[in-house]
Amino acid sequence: VTIKGCSHITGGGFYENIPRMLPDGVKAVVKKDSYEVPAIFKLLAKTGDIEEEMMYNTYNMGIGMVLAIDPADVDKTMEALKAGETCYELGQVEAGEKCAELV
């Protein structure tokens, strides 16, 4: 498996960190329903009355690292990662302006 991009989701969340791994001319489309957001982030959003966009721009929402790989390598990558990590297929890379688009 060739890792084409890697992003550590820290301060700046999805919106600031994911685009750093992308070349010009593509965007990362992240499906928010592709995993269960941990309860602590839901509680923080509700208690602090924080809008969803701000949550994804400030926190990692339970995702510590994002990898970009060839779609043909998804199964092999997931199998390898599940040997010691919790992992999810979050979305895909598409043509577009460099950004992280959450849908």
For each predicted feature, which ranges?
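Glycine-/charge-enriched secondary-structure boundary and capping motifs
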Residues: 1-103
